């Protein structure tokens, strides 16, 4: 009986965790659709341009990223196709850490421990990565 109760509470917490990450993706993704609303817009466009060698315009890159983030949101909140959604979160988060390497002067006051506001904005993503790892583990256990 106790283990069943624990599972029910735990399952609710997992749903809350999944929906919370989805809300963050909705908020940050939706802002990118409107020029000047995302505080990360310049950082994002500069990073993507560096990764892709300027293959697409900044506007196109921003719209693609916003669409990707909103798609992740839909999958996480709906609970559909969770494994692809979580893999997308991992890929997105890996990319979100690249400004630490590409633009250290924007990310650090004192490398490697003194973050700027931009660096703090990037490092908070470690919380999303940790939450996604919990979701991934839960999906693995469900598929057993």
Language-model features: where?
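Membrane-interface extramembranous regions
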Residues: 1-144
